[in-house]
């Protein structure tokens, strides 16, 4: 038969023990047992919803059952037929070029009936679709032009494996030009390894089809068949699935992506080139389902003589070894599929977030006493999955280091969510192998609880996940979280908060509270009844929030109405994957749209030029560029002020390491309500050091209107200069990774010189996503208050392969040019509907002893005559403000109506006085040092303080900021006052392991003895 390379080490030892004479062979399905299947059948008889689930499963599997066993067997392609996730992403379609770009990253569909030709359609057995042909969704041209299936069959060896050298080359011709003398006879012909277009460019259509259509279709078929078996106990579904799984076990030992990587084929492999069927980062999730499905159908294979007869016949016909018994077949699957998955983990050809879950599933599917337990033990070891992976990716690592203290993973957006969602699955996975009792995840890993709670905390307005880093789309909108998540969390923890979340996400419908496996339970409504009984009935209110290592904060209005609410968010995370160079990037939601839309996910990841030079660059974000280079966003940031005292919510975040050799890089932002429907934003960006400070903004449209300032059109070039063409990198040593990105800004207008006076820029929002109601006309108006050396407008492009993304956005760049710059950019953002509510904004004169760029006072005059005065100081400062206002602190706000003071707010301050109206405080903040920490109780992390807080200090629910050399944010909500200090409750103060190779050595902490602490106090006065 085949000569498979057997890897040395632990995986080989396990392989021998599984197949050895002392091993107890698998006896039963474990993930979905016979008892669970019986419950499903009973529930089908009792409940309409269960009967519909069964009917749906039967429908999904129908086409697969209709195929004969030989057809199924032939679906599985072998190693030498390449796989690729792109055809040619640089050139697009051979016929229409970049006309295909708006259709997404992976746009090709199966040729044939367009109504059936979705991205990953089954094609071999779906009537109306053409096997091994791809269709451009834009121009509808079909490639390749040859009959690849006939060629494929001619190239099979004795094992039924594809060998290109065996193929009949006479079959490799363009069917539209069958005459050998036709010059187009060989054009657009793909032998599996790509075709050449009329310009000599390579396009990899068959490899794309093999990856996206063929293998994805195989996995979907297995899912459908296994699910149908689990809900019917009909062995016909198990039979068909077993044919596929046995054949996969034939080909899988040879599967290796790296040879194709060396040939230029692409897949998701973190740049390593490694993988098995597909790239290593996606392989784990793909093969996990194969292992799960094998376990599910195992019971249905028992006693199936027809199955044995078929597989035995194919083995004899193709010299595949002895498969004359069910024991031989299941042994073959265990050795050549399940244990090959283990070997893939060992040699790192299987990576990604699913590795530990895959190992548990393999152990469960093997169901071999002793061996299965040892396989599961390995996921807790520092060396997992391999000593060749020096970082280690054990479950301990995931639940202590990778997952942040708030429950989100160490990457941006959807990537961070995937780590979190991966973590949540482990308790349920281990429950499927109850013989394993050596670890208790709920007791050992307190961050696990937070993974069930964090999704609502990540959102703005309970409606949208900010598009942080490589995530989301430009102006996209969408809620995350699901009732099923909170139901599962409640099942594990019996946590009141999770019951409340489940009830809210289910809109109070008990039927939506059924767990995902409800059909397999004896009483599927028991948990929904319990949740309905304990869920709270208090009105839900939004709150301002922040997450530490992830580095995202949200200030928002309290009413949970996305159409009327307003929210801002800031980015300041530390060491996040898929991060952009976006330190202190600002976002704003108002009037049901994204007013400062981040560009979101790039057209492609990897080394895609536009991704690095533009989409992920600093200049494309709403933040400050220094030295005309990108900032070092992943150096982290720290919150120094966080107050939510409606109608004012204010924060300050510092990112001192965003650039080398600077003294300050910090942003103060306040969200101020003027009514139930409108708020404005004060934005103060302070920076000291470096050259050329450029503050970039872009609004929700491709056009912008400037008032009070004349702009001059630059007829040629880009923002990089009139002689620099689009995307050009003219500088010495300039690359896509170090460029300023200025050459990606085009259609430039400039002020022609310094600007000293106040001006505005107005964007009328474009409705790209159907979010603007009839009769509404949202705008964003920016009030610029800072003298600068130049103002420029230019257009920049969002990724063009994301549905709903605009063609371009209009950027405002305010530049202060020079050496050793000291800047205080002061900007007011006014999101409004149809008619502005601000008449004018102006800087007020101030007198104080601090540096000029550390203090600012602004008057905001409303159309109705109301005047707000806002004062922002970098540090606590005594200030006299124009108009007889006295202030001593960091942030203050006064609202004056008809000449009378109506309200005051101040933070980290002791005095705010307007005439005879004063707000005074003896204690602007509590300050001191940390004397001890205690993280022994995962529900009560304690920090001792000197001096300790008075028992009656009004600080519970407020923020405590710790100042130390930890690069990530060290701000916590105070959950309780203790005798010696405070408690952060269940939000841990643990950072990571002291020694990643020895977990018993203990932990590093985010807070330590002698760290300085500050608890700013906040005060208000309403008249």
Language-model segments: what does each one mean?
Residues 502-727, 819-823, 827-835, 842-850:
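Catalytic and substrate-binding regions of extracellular carbohydrate-active enzymes
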Residues 123-210:
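Long, low-complexity, polar/charged, intrinsically disordered or flexibly structured peripheral segments
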Residues 410, 414-594, 819, 849-850, ...:
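Carbohydrate-active enzyme catalytic cores, enriched for enzymes
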Residues 8-17:
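Bacterial N-terminal signal peptides
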Residues 757-863:
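Beta-strand-rich recognition/accessory modules
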Residues 209-453, 459:
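Aromatic-lined, polymer-binding surfaces characteristic
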Residues 812-824, 830-1023:
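Non-catalytic terminal regions with compositionally biased, polar/charged low complexity
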Residues 698-777:
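Polysaccharide-binding surfaces and accessory modules of carbohydrate-active proteins
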